[in-house]
């Protein structure tokens, strides 16, 4: 998302707009002289320039980073004699058989015309070194660009070509045996064409209305709807152009995942991490309803939340706090409930960031001074089972919009990755809404449209607020010259309009000049009057539209209770020696209380730093576009000062340093410490988005030790943090009596904390992540890449199946506090586990159902005799993104040839698809799990009953054909499929429920397990497979407290 308006966003190093096949290109802005050239062939380094001789060897690589369920690839490794490898041999995805050893980058000069590239003859460098492979009888291409020195790459090409000859000879021989070695189990890199929306009955009526409306729009109006008007070129952070002839309004898109950003009279709800820590489905839904209502009252069409990416694979990831925790099922449930709540008020929700936006370092090139964004590399199985899981649940919840991520996935930008957007999102998961880019995440024009992107935000292309769009007028030109099919544009527009109808926004009051609707606030000023097109005015154009921009509609009234309840239930009690908590409101007099740490106080106020881009005072949210302008913030100190019923002596020490004399006479010591992080465009306190480590910040660990070692009474530690923190330096100190992980509580911070400290609310939060004893405990695949490791930074998620607690279980690592853990002020006992089979097991789901309805048919012809030029006398605002063309240059139909390979070979629909979220058979109930829960304590309280599944052991799949001798001498051989072991985590969360019980009360809770819950994604079969054998069902109150066990 964008930087705040007060801050000039840095520019990328490249201004020319270029378009190359999405899976054959380093991103367009890469202009390092070592890697790009204007010549027809790339200049290679002279091998006699003093370099040592190089050794070429093959490295065996297992797909997906494991030896299960994947074939083996051999990757050429160029090694400098006596030196390190010259490139980082990251495996782009589980589908690779071979990687090429060289790469020719786009050769367009930096000074080329910005507006070219849409089928009008842009010069390109020659492609070299591509390796050909067979997939389902078709030809595909793979590229890689890790070689650091091109002369080594040339040698590598020769070696690889020799290997290819041997490989193809082997393939030819194997085809005489059968088709098994056609590698049909390996999904293609590309997926075309983009599936049309409107094939599901739930959306059929909306698509019919949308198709009719779109059919009456001009080309200019259609492009308007797909392209933002530019940064600060409307009242919201994102604004689309209108279609005035059919009275379709400009849409307002506004952050975010914890409330309405840049708006007045709204609520600062606890963010996603705190919400996930409640494990309370009903409460999460209530929060979503309140957020949706506030958006509706403010005139927001599209709320840019919830966030389920990052998933929390990296515990130090800067934006983990925006999402709901480090497990795909927990994330999926919380996201789905939030979406249902938001959309119940007619506001479109946005599931973001699709997908694998796990770290802030190198997510955007201009933020880090590098040529291009990093690539998050993952295998097909982990992509489905971990990262895409919560998005599937969001689509099942009928989400209207999905936002694609900044970085690349498997070396293709997420916002033009056709396998992700067309193949997985729109086909396999049945997504019926529209895909929007994150702000400036679009990196190409033609390829992003063909790859599945439907809306470009904020409209500007490669730079902030420059008015130069990758779509806009260039999309108009591309449709006219037929380089982008008219059918694709029609589907893009219809998806957006259908979502508008689907949420009932056609019934909203129309914005001016037709009515008084639309956004009633400005993201750029708090004053009542202001400019409608702020960026134009800042560029010197005084025609940016002045008027009333803030109507100060009170949207947050009545939502404080919901915010407070979420914050309280999101507090996790992890230590409580001798029942230190809850505190008494009537302690004996005199009673001296010390409150320590700047995290306890208000300091300079909640909005002292724009987008909360600093750490001062109590920590109530992380920083970045996912936060809001707080209407107020109740600090812990303020709430505590009025919490006791009898007279007590409270002395605050709002610094992170303390002298023993300030502690030794206290009857109770409350210590506050925090750890902060946020989005990568803000650097604060030496933190560049991602945390540098998992320790408390600003001397928090030292402060806790000093207080705990000297306090005369018990010490209670309160931690406000964006994720797990390492507590080993103080957690076992005798003086540390109680510890609360209060996460990020939002505006009601102090009030919610007091509710739990004094027992007005039970301590019922549970950890949505694992607290390890060190950062290294989470595994090498969970570490942020802090130093650039290649021309295109590579992050390999080799252990992604083993995220968080799964990694601890796999390697038998003892955490400090496990996933799902949390103490209560009462006690609970689970008993009487009963598992009921609901239907017979079968290995595969039912066949994909046929389309429920026919999607709209579109006119595939470009418009004829339609005026696409700026109207005569039209005053074009500076920086505004228009769809009009200044001239007809480049609009003649052209034989565009730069399409990605496979574009003209339509893909077959996935057997895993067929409805919202996938094949409906995947969500059929296979088993019911019942358990009795009893409150055995003396207080009312809540607990979270958690169900985990262990998959059968010794699961195998048929692999590649291998030679097996028929006779003893081995002179005759046959080919048989190899047997490959399929690995699984020890156990995985599959369901949970939160239950409230009075003292002595018992209740039976019931949870279901679906086919998908009991299946794994087979990269070979490209489907969800339920293995034969017994499943172990575990039920308890955390991932390591599972007293009940049964079989299914």
From Swiss-Prot:
One of its GO terms (biological process) is cellulose catabolic process. The keyword Hydrolase applies. It comes from the Eukaryota. It is found in: Cell membrane. InterPro entries: Cellulose_deg_GH3 (IPR050288), Fn3-like (IPR026891), Glyco_hydro_3_C (IPR002772), Glyco_hydro_3_C_sf (IPR036881), Glyco_hydro_3_N (IPR001764), Glyco_hydro_3_N_sf (IPR036962), Glycoside_hydrolase_SF (IPR017853), Ig-like_fold (IPR013783). GO terms for molecular function: beta-glucosidase activity. SUPFAM superfamilies: (Trans)glycosidases, Beta-D-glucan exohydrolase, C-terminal domain. The keyword Transmembrane helix applies. The chain crosses the membrane at residues 151-171. Residues 1-150 are cytoplasmic. This is Probable beta-glucosidase E. It comes from Aspergillus oryzae (strain ATCC 42149 / RIB 40). The gene is bglE.
